[in-house]
Amino acid sequence: MSKKVKVIFTILLALLVVGGLSKIFLSKHSSEYAYNIGDTVKIKDQSLVVNSVKTSMGEGNDKPKEGNEFLILNLTLKNNGGSELNYNPYSFQIENAKGEIKDRTFTAIDGKEALDKGTLAPGEEVTGTIVVQEPIGAKDLKLNYVPNIFKKDVATVKL
């Protein structure tokens, strides 16, 4: 095999691994440990609490797809460590009963409460919401928190 073909093969393999890493990891490990709404979930130097989950059919033109509803998850993330903690709303994913994983939904339904990306100093916490869209009355949903896709730290909260 020529050097050029080996390089292309290596790049493609790396893209496949990185691109599918979080979904593969979550489907393999997400059900091992599951917390409930209101539980404090500790992951290394941080903690997460899902404070509440509400449903909404939207407002005005900001509505879910037909047959779906918005789930508004209010959560608190705290930095218990000695250095800064970066956080991102894309670290949170919803897993349904079929094992399908979805990221947050772009909507204005949660307004100023929406969790954005940011940095927490030691001892600081942030409370905000993320919104997802699921079929009305969906059961057995889980929130997976993946603070770093390159490490094996995953927290799962039953919704």
Each model region followed by its residue ranges:
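Conserved functional micro-motifs across diverse proteins
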Residues: 2-159
